[in-house]
Amino acid sequence: MSGVRQFNECPRALRMTPKKPVPIDSKPAWRIIERTMNKSAKLAELRHSLARYGLPPERTPLATGHPQADAVLGGGLRPGSLHEIFAQGWSGGGFAVLLALLAASRKSFFWIRPDYEAMEYGAVSPHGLLELGGDPRQMILVRTRNAVDALAAANDVLACPHVGALLLEMEGMPKCLDLVASRRLAFAAGESGVTVFLLRNGAAAQPSAALTRWQVRSAPSLPGDDDWGKPVFDARLTRHRLGGLGDFLMQWNPEDGCFTDVSKSEANTSAVVRAPARRPAVEKIAI
């Protein structure tokens, strides 16, 4: 019985014992090291979580050739990321396909567009792509019935890491293209390393996981003698998750395959480029 009584009274005595503060210096060293390791693990987990929500991994920036734009972008566009391009007409398509050519380099790139986009903004011309300095054999055009099919096709393309770039064209504000869908696109782009350009025709800006957002419209070309002039775009960077914003006048140079500053360009330059090897020359074809 005494053993039972002692067992019952022992916890009461312990509860009544006043607690004394333990000095910080008296904590074992192994416990301090354990806390430091736990903090490092939590920071690593947080960085991984941020990457999954659209912040791309570190990759070499893709220089556009425009000095002011590249300076604001931190060296250029970030590969393996989602970039949005908003426009109210055909000028957005021209700017987007030039960025896709730039990002794809010598690889193939996909252009996915619903059927009604071709009826509204015109069909894709291989001759026009040739005059812009690209090779029509690089482009793989995918036409879908609606925006849902276009989004599904884009996710399938992003499963292949050997694609140079992806241009996804959308009209208006379809319900399927919400914040969750943009996060999936951004995550797939980061995993595969494929740069995605989301062309939004006639749409208003809405929350998305895009790294950059551009508002684009056409600008007058420099005067020429008897040619069309090189394409010039008034491109406004309205969102940049890793840096600043800016408004740029960007001219596409087909010979060099990059953008240049209009103020530094020579006047009366020709828009007809040298034809690639083993391909016929094309002269003065409207794009």
Locate each region found by the language model:
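Helical mechanochemical/support elements of P-loop NTPase systems and associated helical scaffolds
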Residues: G65, G94, Y121, A150, ...
